[in-house]
Amino acid sequence: MKSQEITKRWVDFFVNKGHTAVPSASLVSSDPSLLFTVAGMVPFIPYLTAREEPPYSRATSVQKCIRTGDIEEVGKTARHGTFFQMCGNFSFGDYFKEDAIKFAFELLTTSVDDGGYGLPAERLWVTVYEEDDEAKELWLKNTGIPAERIQRMGKADNYWSTGQPGPAGPCSEIYYDRGPAYGIEGGPLADETRYIEIWNLVFMQYQIENVRSKVDFDIVGELPQKNIDTGLGMERLAMILQGVENMYETDQVRPVIDKAAELSGREYTSAESPEDPHHTDDVRMRVVGDHIRSALMLIADGVAPSNEGRGYVLRRLIRRAVRAMRLLGVEKACLPDLLPASRDAMKGVYPVVETDFARISRIAYAEEKAFLRTIASGTARLEDAVAESKAAGVPLSGADAFALHDTYGFPIDLTLEMAEEAGLQVDEAGFRALMLEQRQRAQADAKGKKGGHADLSAYQELLGKGETVFTGYDELEGEAKVRGIVSGGRAVAHASTGDEIELVLNETPFYAEAGGQSADTGLITGDGFVVEVLDVQRPIKGLSVHKAIVREGEIGSDALVRAAVDRERRHAAEQAHTGTHIVHAALHQILGPEATQRGSYNKAGYLRFDFAWGEGLSTATRSEIEEVSNIAIRNNFRVDTKVMGLAEAKALGAMALFGENYGSEVRVVEIDGAWSRELCGGTHVSNTSLIGSLSLLGEQSVGSGNRRVEAFVGLDAFRHLAAERALVSELTELLKVPSGQLADRISSTLNKLKATEKELDRLRKEQLAAAAANLVGTAKDAAGVRVVAHDAGQVGGADDLRNLALDLRNRLGSEASTVAVAGVSNDRPVILIATNEAAREAGVKAGALVRLAAGILGGGGGGKDDVAQGGGTDAGKVSEALTAVVDAIAKR
């Protein structure tokens, strides 16, 4: 049974059971605490946790998910994949355990002809929470599965909670017995390779408090509304129904594996055991199949490669796939062959991967091209680092390996492999330590950005008192009541001068950072206190949290206050936000509708706008964007906002941020009607002339297939232009030319500088050649081998010595000859030895001689028999090292 048919049967079955079919949400989660949608229940969390009223009592979905926590296991097991589809059915206070169990058993065991999956009931095993006698009895009563195939497990395996106070409940999991060929008998408790989990039923029925860990908490009572949350792994079921060994061989992934095998000329054999000689290649092909599909789906949902967040995950997936292909022997660009194979396998379920393939492929191919350049430049840097480490006689440092990874994007496994080929070890422990340190810094930074508290219970308690009403569209100052004060993640009764707090009001004119617009700042005052608002965030939907510091007095958790936004700063932010919409419209007008928004940020006087585009913008194009934007500002276009249904907004052509999740009702911002029409919750000027002017700073790449423009607006734009005018004036004075001739004069000066550098390089080479000619006459016989041993003194670097040694070797002719030249560069001695073929036949090996000399110099080195390089720390022993080389040749 094909994957498309599996998902269709799922939806049809539950729709027939009274469920509403809900389309998959984007892989880009609307939950700010998640990078991606990681489970089928994520879009339903507000309903399952009773934060929002669900629009239906029963729902079903097939949700796209991404998880990369076990990325290193991909390809090695039958079950680990980064992209997967979770089939789910949900009940919000409607049916509970019995119907959930009956539905699951019915769908799994009903014959294929009657719309089910046709699994033999005798191959099904079930686990229940060890204390959930009710679930076991319901399985026995409704399915006929015997008691010996129902096993009990503890909280770690069969109890669901968020890890925070709130809803929780026991689980029941359904397993499929793959047969004795896959492991020992005894059910899931004995072997989860043979018995593979396919469906998890969560019975959300309890309220928990005092959470000490995921398995240590207090159950304080039953929920007034009991919910059902289930998830079936579509790929796992497909694996069973299609009779294949693992999820990678199902119909949505196998075509990519086959293409990888074709490109590499290797055979895919389904090898599972590391002892199998085909295992390594098969794992690499499975990695390619998995990662290419994940990359396809992420780009389709609006993610672009970058060095942080979601973009970094995408970049890593693409680069791991390309790296796996290189290890399979394919060094050319391979995504133009692999990505279409994945598109064709997925388009039946997700038509967007075909209709939007031009954009998807442009981004993916550009990322592969960039990575291939990275490998080329990283290889050169690695070779330098290897040479330096060899010269010093030490392993390649963890710092060097980390720099290659962090700066060049050079994979550590490639560093290890190439260093091993060069006969050099790598301080892998040092590299791992630096990687851990970087992750810890990133986690700390992310924690700070999200308010510093992973525990949202204090906010959820405050939300229980009511949502924060935002009044800032209509007023910048108003009366309000304090709903609560949070300090250190806990609610407090009051705060005094100097305390840093998070303040929640019943209503507020302060705009919370969202949609790319920075938060308002200002003052909250009352009887005897002054609080300065530094930032405003929404840690959970419906709650505005003012991050503030008490400047005077003491504020209580039920105080009456006056909230006043910094008007000048808000106006400057509104100038920037409306300016962002204008730039977006200008880009569409000049580049076309494919220049879609990928992100934005605006604050007082400044805007940044990221958009989909595959190449840099010319100076003329940038000038045109700036001109169109300023004409719109000068035309005094009216800016209007309207609230309407999402369908109506789309019908009007309102632009939305790709991959963003919107509610059923949206806010639309229009500039001169249809000239610019976007979904936006931010604040704006009332007409474009209030922006004053807009000055582009330039544009740059921000990842494959994406560009960024930056601009100043209003007074900041004037200041920017004034600074540029002053710079031009300074340059004209310095170079003694009119401003119109500046570019020509600077270009001429740079050309002269390049010519001078070229001449210096020519003279240096001539000096080396002259030195080589003079040194030929200094050759001495050492047991039948002519030897030139020369101390060059201070040198520019190892390249100078290499060029001198090779020139000398050529000048000495075919007679057995060896050249040893040494010098000091950056206070460290360097030695280079070159031998000709006759000398090598006479037993003279450059690598062995360099190790001898470098040992005397207090370091190490290595190389081949014909050319080798070394170095050390004791520059005072250069003469001794050269003498030792000559003696060794004479005594060989």
UniProtKB/Swiss-Prot annotation:
The record's principal subcellular location, in a coarse class, is: cytoplasm
Reactions it catalyzes: tRNA(Ala) + L-alanine + ATP = L-alanyl-tRNA(Ala) + AMP + diphosphate
Keyword field: Aminoacyl-tRNA synthetase, ATP-binding, Cytoplasm, Ligase, Metal-binding, Nucleotide-binding, Protein biosynthesis, RNA-binding, tRNA-binding, Zinc
Record InterPro entries: aa-tRNA-synth_II/BPL/LPL, Ala-tRNA-lgiase_IIc, Ala-tRNA-ligase_IIc_anticod-bd, Ala-tRNA-synth_IIc_core, Ala-tRNA-synth_IIc_N, Ala-tRNA_ligase, Ala_tRNA_ligase_euk/bac, DHHA1_dom
Sites where the protein binds Zn(2+): 577, 581, 680, 684
GO terms under cellular component: cytosol
Q: Which SMART domains match?
A: tRNA_SAD
Per the UniProt entry, the Enzyme Commission number(s) are 6.1.1.7
Q: What is the enzyme's class at the highest EC level?
A: ligase
What is its cofactor? Zn(2+)
Spell out the molecular function terms from Gene Ontology: alanine-tRNA ligase activity; aminoacyl-tRNA deacylase activity; ATP binding; tRNA binding; zinc ion binding
Compartments where located: Cytoplasm
What's the record's note on cofactor binding? Binds 1 zinc ion per subunit.
Q: Name one GO biological process term.
A: alanyl-tRNA aminoacylation
Q: Which family does it belong to?
A: Belongs to the class-II aminoacyl-tRNA synthetase family.
What is the annotated role of this protein in its UniProt record? Catalyzes the attachment of alanine to tRNA(Ala) in a two-step reaction: alanine is first activated by ATP to form Ala-AMP and then transferred to the acceptor end of tRNA(Ala). Also edits incorrectly charged Ser-tRNA(Ala) and Gly-tRNA(Ala) via its editing domain.
Q: What does the comment on domains in this protein's record state? A: Consists of three domains; the N-terminal catalytic domain, the editing domain and the C-terminal C-Ala domain. The editing domain removes incorrectly charged amino acids, while the C-Ala domain, along with tRNA(Ala), serves as a bridge to cooperatively bring together the editing and aminoacylation centers thus stimulating deacylation of misacylated tRNAs.
Q: Which NCBIfam families match?
A: alaS
Name of the molecule in the record: Alanine--tRNA ligase
- Tell me which species this is from: Paenarthrobacter aurescens (strain TC1)
